[in-house]
Amino acid sequence: MTAPAATQEETDGPPRSLVAGARAIVMARDPAEKVRLARSTARAWRERTLSLGALSVEHGMPDRPGRPDRPVLLPPRDMPRRSSHGARGRIALLHSLAHIELNAVDMTWDLVGRFAREPMPRSFFDDWVGVGHEEAEHFALVSRRLAELGAGYGDLPAHDGLWQAAQATGHSLIARIAIVPLVLEARGLDVSPAMITSLEAAGDQASAAVLGVIYRDEMRHVAHGAKWFRFLAERDGQAPEPLFQSLVRQNFRGPIKPPFNDRARAEAGLTPGFYKPLVAVGRFS
């Protein structure tokens, strides 16, 4: 099932509300349009020219985001194995990263729109609008680097596993925060330094610089996740660490496995007591 097309009213000009802007971003099929809408919506929110707004029966968040015709989306198990060496390997790495960032755009703006009904401080939306804007800029950065290498997003197949995390947590804000920033983005903190080192060793300083920007921003995204997870847990009178572990066991479809970048995670507020008890434990492991 594909996302319904956004209306012209939703995509032309400034959004009527933050929720309307978030919905239009998720529904847009063209990645460049997602980036444009994310920029304009984030700017309007920062300038305090948008109300929060609300979803309605007729205008709810879609079950699936808008997507271009390419790349072909495959189940993760059907993805072809690719060499990590040479120019083709770097293009494959960047293409995979572009796909991750496009999903991050949709997952973040879906969080903003879907959970606007929650009684949260305005600073909560300030943080996640900022994250949504940065995810869009990450996609744009990686796309430009792919173009410099003679490639583009859509040239290779991609897997459809990431959006499943959004679908699995659409019922719960605290579950969404547990899985997306505190599992998926935290994993980026684990793997990015080695990828940056590998690109530098291959002489691809430009691609390494792109990953460096993303890595630094991911630290902030995980920090936002840790802050708001604690806020929600403590508001409900629950201890954050065991609650996190329970939510991951219920809602995440894979193992939590080392190696971990413990220092970066801790700097972002995600201390080992959250994730070490989950090592090699997954919903279907």
Description of each model-found segment:
Residues 2-285:
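Non-heme di-metal
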